[in-house]
């Protein structure tokens, strides 16, 4: 008999223990989930962690391929797959393993299987169809907890097809005698109608019954379903109006007595239910005077009786104020709501203060006087340590600025700008600029305010603000001397603020000669220079060149341009020679743009005829437009009607002299919502080609002659140029050409399909009778009056039986309150229903990218008939 050496025996056992056996019948020993997590956390480098994960993934794949029916091993595999999913690793190879786990009759296995299915699967994967049988069986289980698992999984992963297959089973469970199952079934039905709105009729009657339930959970679920259904299909609001009296009675009971001690929070009776009822009543009462009258008394009672010392009470009060605003209640209720929100601002809880500031921003247009009474409290929030509260308080403060308080409010905002963090410095500077442009009492105050902004936040100022500042100075001759002296002194103190340096260079280049012999008396201000020589002016520009970073080439270019202009403004030949040497010294600069400017300006200075023409003083431009940035809808409507009337009167005058469509019409006034103008209207209001801007005059000296611009003719004459069959002598028949264009003879009311992130998407459907094509105009609107949308992108998909043509967006960005649109054309079988899947990407100014998907099938059914 052969004996084994003890050392060899030790090695053999060690190999088996570590799982190195190759026996096909024995599974290698797997580490537990706990040890896997410890191994990942113990990794000292990213590479080591990645290696650990790859080894474990390979082991899981191997176990799955061997096809063991051991449920314990399967649970361990799926648990590790969930951890890999949390780490962002691929887990597609384990999807079938999750479904196999559902075949077990044990609750433990089903719980893990459904959890994995909800996380590792989504409604777009084909493997989801294999889940149908398991869901159908578990929905009929006698164990209410297994039914609950199936309902939860169904609501999270079911797509439109699976929703249609099992919708009847869900409807039956809504009437189940177990409140636990009934509650989950209604919430599941909510998910169903969000994905397939056509199935709402299966659940409406059952929801009516459940709205009378005495169970807290069932009633909450029924209210959530009703709110969502009314938002998806507003025609259902009238269907639920009969429930208003019972809901009003319930909330009166909740606000005056203990309705259910089980759900009390801080002596507040069931605050979650109160909030949900108020949300639903705000929908029911919007267009129903009877419900509105009953709710006015109810809202006053809720606002009076609710304890505001508890956070739960504040939640109810907040929803009550939102309901007051949604219903457009009378002034007394709105003032009461404003007072409640102002009281929130004194709360210690940051969340309470934040939502109060957000809500006050919505009510300031309708109840400005009431909000103005709490101005000091709002301004105090600017000093909060929380930057998000500072940001909301800053936005609200700008809404409070008007002609009467502009000096006080801007002074407070400037004080805030001096101490604010870099995170908010740019937006603060922008807000101050906007309110100053709108309400400045005089030009000197306007200049002084923007100059202080440039001193505090010159590195955060936008190009548009810099342009407005220079335009303000150039358009006001009385500011020229004052501005050049102030900017010269500011430049001597600080050259670190880019906007301040650029504006000082431009102004010194244009009006630098005024520094030599000022006519104004500046003796009272000790910070201003009393005497300046030509060499002092050139010295300050050289000092800036020597102190700025080498990468800030834009400052050098502005400085070279200022020196070039100064050579014509200052009379000394020695100064002109010095300037020429400084400019020519940059001909070997690392930056090609600086090189080019150096050579160009050197050639200009050495050509007396050319320099005399180019370096003439810039003509005064038009002053910056004085527009109010924060107007309510009524003010905008009045302003636009006024503009349309002026344009119409202008067109009528042009008709009298035979010019039906003016080719060189300048607008008498700019509409408030300029972004909403169509491309045709923008063309018809284009400035005359014979009247160039002053900046074009300067640039034209270095450019080649431009081709003569053709006048903008009417739309008919534009189409006439496309008639290739007509002879040259034959007059074009514009009417016949226009008649060949397909006409949209039938239109439909607009439909709002998306309202998130302060962006709304409205679809305006119409039908071309001649081509049987559905034409849908998608209109985006930026509801935020403060921040712009940097980029917006829309992706659209239709069913396979239909064809889609989509035109690009008119503009991919939206100013505050602005709009943009694009046109969709859908062609398909006659009588088919147009259904759209919309994917909307929104990038806000200073914010992150948000991506939302909307499935919409409620378009008119006769679009393709």
UniProtKB/Swiss-Prot annotation:
The UniProt record lists the keyword Transferase: no
Biased composition (Polar residues): 675-690
InterPro entries: Adaptor_Complx_Large_Subunit, AP1_complex_gsu, ARM-like, ARM-type_fold, Clathrin/coatomer_adapt-like_N, Clathrin_a/b/g-adaptin_app_Ig, Clathrin_app_Ig-like_sf, GAE_dom
Coiled-coil region(s): none
SMART domains for this protein: Alpha_adaptinC2
Membrane topology: Peripheral membrane protein
Pfam families to which the protein is assigned, alphabetical: Adaptin_N, Alpha_adaptinC2
Gene Ontology annotations of biological process type: endosome to plasma membrane protein transport; Golgi to vacuole transport; retrograde transport, endosome to Golgi
Superkingdom, natural source: Eukaryota
One MF annotation (Gene Ontology) recorded for this entry: clathrin adaptor activity
Chain ranges of the GAE domain: 746-860
Keywords of this entry: Cytoplasmic vesicle, Golgi apparatus, Membrane, Protein transport, Transport
UniProt xrefs under PROSITE patterns: GAE (PS50180)
Stretch list, region Disordered: 665-690
GO cellular component: AP-1 adaptor complex; cytoplasm; cytosol; endosome; Golgi apparatus
Keyword Membrane among UniProt keywords: yes
Compartment list: Cytoplasmic vesicle, Clathrin-coated vesicle membrane; Golgi apparatus
Purpose: Adaptins are components of the adaptor complexes which link clathrin to receptors in coated vesicles. Clathrin-associated protein complexes are believed to interact with the cytoplasmic tails of membrane proteins, leading to their selection and concentration. The AP-1 complex interacts directly with clathrin.
Record-stated family: Belongs to the adaptor complexes large subunit family.
Subunit structure of this chain's protein: Adaptor protein complex 1 (AP-1) is a heterotetramer composed of two large adaptins (gamma-type subunit apl4 and beta-type subunit apl2), a medium adaptin (mu-type subunit apm1) and a small adaptin (sigma-type subunit aps1). AP-1 interacts with clathrin.
Name recorded for this polypeptide: AP-1 complex subunit gamma-1
Species assigned in the record: Schizosaccharomyces pombe (strain 972 / ATCC 24843) (Fission yeast)
């Amino acid at each position: 008999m052969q004996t084994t050496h003890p050392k060899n025996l030790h090695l053999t056992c060690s190999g088996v223990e570590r799982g190195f056996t190759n026996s096909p019948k024995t599974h290698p020993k797997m580490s537990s989930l706990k040890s896997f997590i410890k191994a990942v956390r113990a990794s000292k480098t990213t590479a080591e962690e990645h290696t650990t994960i790859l080894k474990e993934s390979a082991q899981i794949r191997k176990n799955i391929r061997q096809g063991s029916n051991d449920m314990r091993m399967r649970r361990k595999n799926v648990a590790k797959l969930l951890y890999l999913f949390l780490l962002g690793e691929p887990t597609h190879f384990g999807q079938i393993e999750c479904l196999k786990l559902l075949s077990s009759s044990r609750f433990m296995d089903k719980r893990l299987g459904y959890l994995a299915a909800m996380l590792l699967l989504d409604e777009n994967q084909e493997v989801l169809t294999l889940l149908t049988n398991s869901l159908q069986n578990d929905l009929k289980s006698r164990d209410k907890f297994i039914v609950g698992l199936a309902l939860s999984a169904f609501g999270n992963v079911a797509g439109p097809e699976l929703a249609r297959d099992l919708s009847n089973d869900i409807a039956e469970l809504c009437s189940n005698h177990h409140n636990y199952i009934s509650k989950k079934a209604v919430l599941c039905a909510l998910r169903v109608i969000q994905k397939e709105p056509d199935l709402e009729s299966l659940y409406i009657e059952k929801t009516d019954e459940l709205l009378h339930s005495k169970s807290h959970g069932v009633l909450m679920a029924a209210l959530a379903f009703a709110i969502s259904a009314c938002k998806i299909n507003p025609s259902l609001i009238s269907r639920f109006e009969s429930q208003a009296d019972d809901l009003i009675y319930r909330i009166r009971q909740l606000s005056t007595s203990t309705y259910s001690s089980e759900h009390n929070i801080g002596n507040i009776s069931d605050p979650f239910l109160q909030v949900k009822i108020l949300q639903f009543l705000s929908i029911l009462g919007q267009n129903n005077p009877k419900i509105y009258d009953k709710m006015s008394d109810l809202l006053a009672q809720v606002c009076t009786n609710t304890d505001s010392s508890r956070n739960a009470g504040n939640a109810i009060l907040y929803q009550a104020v939102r309901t007051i605003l949604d219903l457009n209640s009378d002034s007394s209720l709105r003032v009461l709501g404003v007072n409640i929100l102002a009281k929130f601002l004194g709360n210690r809880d940051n969340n309470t203060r934040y939502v109060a500031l957000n809500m006050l921003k919505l009510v300031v247009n309708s109840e400005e006087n009431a909000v103005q009474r709490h101005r000091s409290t709002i301004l105090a929030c600017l000093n909060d340590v929380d930057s998000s509260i500072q940001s909301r308080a800053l936005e609200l403060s700008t809404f409070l600025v008007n002609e009467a308080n502009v000096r006080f409010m801007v002074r407070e905002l400037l004080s805030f700008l001096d101490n604010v963090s870099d995170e908010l410095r740019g937006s603060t500077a922008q807000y101050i600029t906007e309110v100053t442009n709108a309400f400045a009492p005089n030009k000197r105050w306007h200049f002084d305010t923007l100059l202080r902004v440039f001193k505090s936040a010159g590195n955060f100022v936008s190009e548009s603000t810099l342009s407005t500042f220079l335009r303000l100075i150039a358009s006001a001759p009385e500011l020229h001397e004052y501005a050049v002296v102030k900017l010269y002194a500011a430049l001597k103190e600080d050259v670190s603020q880019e906007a301040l340096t650029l504006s000082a260079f431009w102004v010194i280049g244009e009006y630098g000669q005024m520094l030599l012999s000022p006519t104004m008396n500046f003796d009272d201000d000790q910070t201003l220079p009393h005497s300046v020589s030509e060499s002092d002016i050139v010295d300050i520009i050289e000092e800036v060149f020597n102190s700025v970073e080498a990468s800030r080439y834009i400052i050098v270019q502005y400085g070279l341009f200022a020196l070039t202009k100064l050579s014509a403004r200052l009379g000394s030949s020695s100064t002109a020679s010095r300037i020429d040497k400084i400019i020519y010294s940059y001909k070997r600069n690392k930056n090609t743009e600086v090189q080019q400017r150096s050579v160009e300006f050197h050639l200009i200075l050495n050509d007396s005829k050319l320099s005399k023409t180019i370096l003439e003083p810039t003509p005064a431009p038009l002053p910056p437009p004085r527009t109010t940035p924060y107007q309510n809808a009524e003010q905008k409507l009045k302003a636009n009607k006024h503009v349309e009337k002026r344009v119409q009167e202008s067109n009528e005058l042009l008709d009298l002299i035979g010019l039906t469509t003016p080719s060189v019409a300048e607008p008498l006034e700019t509409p408030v919502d300029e972004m909403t103008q169509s491309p045709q209207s923008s063309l018809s209001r284009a400035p005359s080609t014979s009247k160039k801007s002053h900046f074009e005059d300067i640039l034209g000296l270095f450019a080649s002659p431009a081709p003569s611009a053709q006048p903008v003719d009417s739309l008919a004459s534009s189409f006439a140029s496309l008639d290739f069959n007509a002879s040259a002598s034959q007059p074009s028949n514009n009417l016949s050409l226009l008649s060949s264009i397909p006409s949209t003879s039938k239109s439909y009311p607009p439909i709002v399909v998306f309202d998130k992130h302060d962006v709304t998407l409205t679809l305006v459907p119409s039908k071309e009778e001649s081509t049987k094509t559905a034409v849908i105009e998608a209109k985006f609107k930026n509801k935020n009056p403060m921040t712009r949308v940097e980029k917006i992108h829309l992706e659209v998909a239709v069913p396979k039986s239909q064809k889609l043509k989509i035109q690009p967006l008119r503009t991919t960005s939206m100013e505050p309150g602005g709009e943009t649109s694009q046109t969709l054309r859908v062609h398909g079988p006659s009588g088919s229903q147009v259904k759209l899947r919309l994917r909307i990407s929104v990038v806000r100014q200073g914010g992150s990218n948000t991506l939302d998907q909307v499935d919409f099938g409620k378009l008119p059914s006769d679009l393709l008939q």
